[in-house]
Structures are given as structure tokens and as C-alpha cells.
Amino acid sequence: MRAERVLSLSGPNVWSNRSVLEAWIATDDELENDARDRTSIHKRLAFEASSFATTNGWADTEPCQVLQELWLALLRQVGEPAQRGWVRSAGLDDVTQCAVECGDELIARRCLELALRWYAAVACEEALPVGKLLSDLRDFADDRRLGRTTGPIVAAAQARGIPAYRLDAESLVQFGQGSRQRRVRTAVTDQTGFIAEAIARDKQLTKNLLAQLGLPVPIGRTVSSEDDAWAAASEVGWPVVVKPRDADFGNGVSLRLRTRDEVTAAYRKAKEFSEAVLVEQQLEGFPHRVLIVGERIIGAVRREPARIIGDGRRTVLELIEELNNDPRRGLAEDKTRPWFFVPTDDNVRIALTHQDCDWQSVPAIGQEINLRWQSCDWQGDGMFDATDEIHPDVAESLIDAVRLVGLDVAGVDLIATDLLRPLDEQHGGILEINAEPAILVHMRPVCQPSRPIPEAIVSHLFPRPDEAHIPIIAMLSDSTTDEVSRWLSHWLQCGSVRVGRASRDGTWLGQRRLSSEPSDNAFRVRSLLLHPRVDNLVCQLSAESIRREGLPFDRCAAAVLLSSASHKPHPACQGGSRAFALRDGELRSTDAREPLGQAQWGEDHAKPLSVDRLLARIGASRGFVVINVDDPYLATLVEELGDRAIPISRDAANLHVINARERGWRAACIRGEAIVLSEGRHEVLIVPTSEPNLALLAALKTGWGLGLAPETLRLEIAASHELSTLTSRTDASHSRRREPETSTLV
């Protein structure tokens, strides 16, 4: 088998309201015709994949169904949210269409490649290093995914219905659309100023500013040499801390230094990470990290250095082994455990040496042995939720500190015996302020329940979720909607409002053309959604673009359907008599001749939606849908959408228009030489025009539905007609004046 075509459908599509990867799989004739050989291949494949896939029934299953099962199993194995898949004939000989929901396109492609390679290896009786390939696939997926800070923030935004667009291969993400967009990279938002971030990186400058505000900070200064470091240590009092002035993540930090040799070694270590080095007084207490978003403390954790308590019998090494048997401890990659294993490394050995111990020492009963001494590495330390233990004075001091630096999201590192008392009462102090704080320590499994850090950051960016969306008017592209898009763009472009338009005649921002290429496709629409100056978006989308790329948005203010694309059915609806839907490993079969209206989009269905119905459902979910009921297929959507549908017709006697008015719904029609807009039995706007047409009818009804005043629309139409008449007369006059010249030339 081989993939003839692979399509990435980002956003709502004909299969699902989630992103889908769709593959067209070609199967060899021999494999299709030889049932015994096929059964043998599937039995061997089921045996090899049984450790992570549900392989029951594979032996008697068709090849592409098995491939689909294996593809889904691989996606789940690497942690992708692949819940559903579909298999059906593509309407071509020996070609089957497979589609799966996926979170990341590149990961889904890699899983498909491995599934095809695995199937081919079994069919050819070749050995394949599946274990190594799976390990490589997991590593690729881990590298490709958003990090442990950005990922939860994106998930929180999507849970609130806020669109998220990944802008690079790292962690730069845009939330929201057009002029309402906001951006984050890890926990740094676009409100984080360059100056504020620079202040936070400079630990000495931060400390000086905090001291001027009267906030408690450790005594210390910047040093320029090893001798100066020793002099500064003697000034501030022992023990001391030596650290880089502008490094992150605890790099180059040495604690509890008491001798000149230790200070000299620590100075050299710090110089590896920064040209400038700080020497500070060592504060006594537990390290704390407090996370602040805006003007609120959202989370706080206390770190207690790993330690053992002697029993008079066992050695240090045996006590560490017992410590690591705590079920709360695990490997760094084990996200279900709040603490890491305590390593038996040089840092622990140094800590033991300072306490006159070694690995084989037997501590006395009740004797405490700290397993961290001079290293700032917190691996193996205990982490405890301290959010509910913060004294009001401490909270105010920390918020003032972050406000002084100028950050909107920050992590404050401080030393305190506990947070239940003011810092000046316990000789605690603020160590530094981080502009790029990690949020994982405030969530499960350290904090149970998790502190709502991602949700707080999203709420900080968008107090109301609907603030993230710009109004989008989407229409199924045809020759009539060209004129509709121009009318609507002109009407919406008022004052300082900037309208982006993607249509068959190019990409536009107001009156400025950004591209002359045909732009009725998802790629061009998405480019306008990323444009920071677009306040409203009017777009045409071709049926082919929607089938091949999906919709670039999950909601719109209005959808316009003037001609049906149903005469060009999705290729998956052509040919074949069986379709298969997979969910959680269970194969389901349906009749491909089932009427499309019976398929439940977003639920278990094997047949894709029509493009018309897809756009109609997206429009009806939050807005309204203008439907040309003169088209027999489109007319069937009116009853399905209810009062979200606005029927329009060239015929005032159209039954759908009459029924809508009798129900109190909105409708529009052409009556004689006038366009009539109505709500129930009340006729809201009657626009006399010498040339009533479907495009103007649709544009007027859409504009009214978007909130444009009827009188404004009437004046706009009148003005455009006057301009058109004046232009026609001027052209005719020029033509008459040029006739003699033309005759002379001839």
C-alpha cells in the first residue's frame, strides 16, 4: 500500500469539527484479490502490534481498515488526541480514503508513514526495528509539541473557544484574530515590555529597585574579580550565595559558601554564564515561587530540599534508596509524579562531605542529613502547594515588586520560613523576578487540584472570550458572490474600521490590494486572520478549497450560500457501497447510499458532509445563514437551521419565504423592481431599484443582519445608483465627443 495523496484539513471540515489528516491509499491488486495472503499478513501484524493496539478481528478485515486501526493506535501511542477515524472508497479503482482526527499535522504524517512502512515490512516478511522506530516517533512528537508552559495555555484558550495559531516550530502562538489578536511565547505575553524583561534579567538592577521601594532583599553587590568576590563575601556576612547577574533557570548559582576556595570556585562557575557576577547574603528559610498574573497571585509553591533522617542502622545510600521508594517520586519525564528521584550524584556527595558524611555513613537516630548544599539544582526536592498560606502583607509586597519591574506575568522567587508572616519578621527576602516563569509546578501533580494558571493568563489577555473574534462574513464562492463581497466590504468600511477581503479578484485590506492572485481559499483567508489591522473579514471560499483545506475558522458572523456545490460531491461520496467509521478502536459499517442529511457531523458518521451544509452549520452556530432558496438543494437547509436561516428568493411567492415570514423569521425577496427585506409580517426595508438581482438582494439582507441600519443601506444603494448613472452619462458624452476624431483616424 502507498499514500497517493495526503490532505491536511485544518479546522472544521467535511469529516469533523476538528482538524483531520486525510490520506488516499492505493492498494496492490494482488493484496486485494488474495484473501489467504491478506489474512496471514494481518495475523502477523496483529501479533506485532498487540502490545498497544486493539487487534481483535484484524485477520478478517480489509487492508485499509487494518492500516487505519494501526494509524490511530500509533497516534494514541505518542499522546495525540486521535479519537476518531473514517475509511471509505475514494471512487477510484484500488484507492481507499482514510481520515483521522489529529492534533498536529506533522506528527500524524509521521504516524501514517510508520504504519505504511510496518504493513509493507510484514507483507514482505522483512524485519523492522519497531521498538526503535516507536521511540524515535515519540521523541519527534515530544519535540514537535508545544512545551509544558505554552501547551496548557493554548489548551485553556481553546477550551474557552479562543482560536490559536502556532506561528513557528517553537512556542510562539497567536490567540484571537485580526486586530483582536494577542501573542504569547511560553508565559511571556505581548504585554511584556522589552524594558521590563531587561530589568528582570538584571538581578542587581531588580534588587536595587526593590530596595528603593522598601521591599526586603538580600544584601550584596556585583563583583569584578575573584578577590573582589572574596571581599564582598566578607562584607555581607557568611554564608553567601554567588550567582550570575543575568542568567536563568538557576544556572551558575552556588549556595551556602563559607570559605575562600568555595567562593573562588563559585565565581568561576558563575562566569561561565555571565560576564557580571553577584555575591549576596544567604537568607535562611525555604525557597518559594509565587506566580502573579496581572494584579493577582494565582499560585505559590514551597520547595523543601531533599533530606534523610537517620535511624542508627542504615547507611546514607540505603536511606536514599528508601526515600526514592516514595510513590510520589518518579523520573523527570513521568508527569504523574510530583517529585523526582534523588540522584546519587556529585551534588549529593558534596552535601554529604559538608556534613562529615559519605555514602556508607550511618546517621544517628533522628539526625537530619541534607542532600543539597551548594547546588541550586532542585531535582529530588519536595514541592508543596503554598497558595493558601500567603499573608496579605506578603501578597501586597510581591504584587508591588512585579508592578515596579513592569511585568504582567511573573514568577517571584523568595526565601521565607513560611508565607504566613510578613517577610521582615522572619528575615526573608525577594531573590529575583522571572519574566518567563514555568507554570508546571503549580499544576498537577504538585498542586491538587491544579492552580488555574493557564486560565488566568488567558483571562488576562481576553477578559471576555468573544473579544478574540473579529466578525467574519463567509460565502461559498461563485460569480454572484464576487459582487456580494464587494458590496459588503464597501458598507462595512466606515470610519476607522478596516475590512479585509479575500475573493476571486485578490486579497484586499480596505481599498489596498495585497495580492492579485485568486484568494477564495483557506490559505489567503488565514493570512488575513493573522493580519493585525483587519477589523472585519469578508471572504469567499471555493468548494474545492474547503474540501482540500477545511475552514480556516470555527465560527462566523454570517454565511452566504447562493449556489449549491452539491453537484460536485466530495470524492468520498462517489462509488463504493461500504463505509467504515472507527472510534476508540471499534469498526462500524454504514451504507454509503444513506442520505447525507442523516449523517451527524461531530458524532459517529462515516460519510462526509457536503460543503454547503458544513458552511451552513458553522454560520448557524454563532450567527446566521443567508440561503438562496431558489436552489432546490440549498432550500432543504432552511428547516434544519430554523430561525438561523434567512431565506432569500427572486420570487416573492416562494414557499420558504412565505413560511419564514409566517413564523416571524427574517426573509428577503424581489418584488417587481424592488428588494423587500422583512421580519415576520413586517416589511423593514423596501429598496426600489431598476436592476434588482440576487447579488444585491443577498448583500442587503446580510448587511441588515449584521446590524447596518436600513436607512443607511437605502442611502448607500441610492448613492451607488446615482454614481452609476453619472458615470454612464459621462462615458456616453466622452464617446460622442470622440466620434469625429475616430472617423478622422479611420
PLM region spans:
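Active-site nucleotide/adenylate-binding loops and adjacent lid/helix of ATP-dependent enzymes
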Residues: 182-343, 392-395, 454
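Walker A (P-loop) phosphate-binding motif
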Residues: 465-506
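ATP-dependent carboxylate activation and anion-phosphoryl transfer catalytic cores
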Residues: 1-158, 296, 304-311, 315-318, ...
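Extended, charge-rich helix/loop segments that form flexible
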Residues: 319-381
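Conserved nucleotide-sensing/catalytic segment adjacent to the nucleotide-binding pocket
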Residues: 513-545, 549
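Short acidic-glycine loop/turn motifs at beta-strand connectors
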Residues: 177, 292-296, 418, 670-671, ...
